[in-house]
Amino acid sequence: MSSAKERLEDLPPSAKLVYKTLEFEGECTQKELVKETRLSSRTVRYAISRLEEKELVEQRVSFRDARQKLYSLAE
C-alpha cells in the first residue's frame, strides 16, 4: 500500500486540513474538527468521507456520548 503522503496528494485542501488537524490535535469529534479547522460541517463531513475512502482516518463511537463518533488517524 502507498504511504499516507502519497494517498493525501490527490485529496482536496479541506481533507488535507482535517488530516493535519487530527495529526496535531489527536482524536476529535466532527464538531471539534469544525471548530479547529473553521470549515463548515458539510465540508468536514465530506473531507472525513474522502479520508476514510483512502484509509487515512478511522472512526469509533465515543464512550462519553454514543451519538458522537471520534475520528483519528488510521494506524
Residue positions per predicted region:
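Short acidic, hydrophobic short linear motifs in intrinsically disordered regions
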Residues: 27-36
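Short, cationic-aromatic polyanion-contact patches
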Residues: 4-15, 29, 59-75
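Residues within the helices of the helix-turn-helix
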Residues: 20, 31, 49
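Glycine-centered, phosphate/nucleic-acid-interacting loop/turn motifs that mediate DNA/RNA or nucleotide
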Residues: 55
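Hydrophobic residues on short alpha-helical segments
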Residues: 15-22
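Short amphipathic alpha-helical interaction segments
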Residues: 39-50, 66
